[in-house]
Amino acid sequence: GFAQYTECGGIVLIREGEEHLYEDNLSSMSAVGAEYELLNASEIEKLYPGITLTSFGPPKTLADEKFGQTSGGKITSAILVPAAGYVSDPQLASHNLQMAAKNHGADFMFNAPVSTVITDKNVSGGVVLKNGDVISSGSTINASGPHSSIINQMAGIADSLKITTRAVRHEVVYLPADARHFQMGGRFLVDTDAGFYQRPDGADLLIGTTDPECDGMNVVNSDHYNASVTEQWTLQAYRAAQRSPA
């Protein structure tokens, strides 16, 4: 089967006085023809019955005694992007890309660790596999996800790149969705004021983080990391509950 793109629409909440922070985003969207609407507070409340537009920011951890307390500001506007959405099965999406590539002549070698990236005067010439096989090529694409920084180091280019990558661990929360979230059509919601995002996922609600400064970064070994639920799960759920308390 094919991975499905669910076009649920998306909304970004904006705290009063922070509208200028999104000017570049809106300019970029206009430049590529991506449609969007600017909403006021009453229009947000119509889309999300029961939502509170009180400001809680900047985001806080549960250990902060001021968590859940209002900070005096308000959410006064939002950006609505009708075409926003998600693909809920990234593994199936990757498999679709694999099959499409094979139909165009690509070959795949699994369980074939790379031991060396061949370079000559900072130009890649292929790779050497752990079993000694050499694959020569005019170019090498690093699409190794959380392992990409290691591959860059093997190629000797890590220190020359303007953009670096790290494997950062995140948790997302799955909760049974409140029916009110879907009665107007479940949407992607991004809330940097409270520090979370949420979106529908079937009959569930997925909640993640917007990476606020107070959380820090949990940089991990991409092959060995904690796969268990931690206090971050509870934190994300509580942050979302601030915005929809009823």
PLM features per residue range, with description:
Residues 42-53, 60-61, 167-168, 230-246:
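Flavin (FAD/FMN) cofactor-binding core of flavoprotein oxidoreductases
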Residues 11-15, 79-85, 227-229:
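Short beta-strand and adjoining strand-loop segment in the mid-core
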Residues 65-139, 143, 147:
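Helical element adjacent to the flavin cofactor pocket in flavoenzyme catalytic cores
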Residues 12, 126, 172-174, 197:
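Conserved hydrophobic/aromatic beta-strand scaffold that supports enzyme active sites
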Residues 131-188, 226:
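Central helical "cap/lid" subdomain
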Residues 161-164, 178-246:
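Active-site lid/adjacent beta-loop-alpha segment flanking the redox-cofactor pocket in flavoenzymes
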Residues 19-23, 41, 94, 148, ...:
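A general structural signal for well-ordered alpha-helical segments in protein cores
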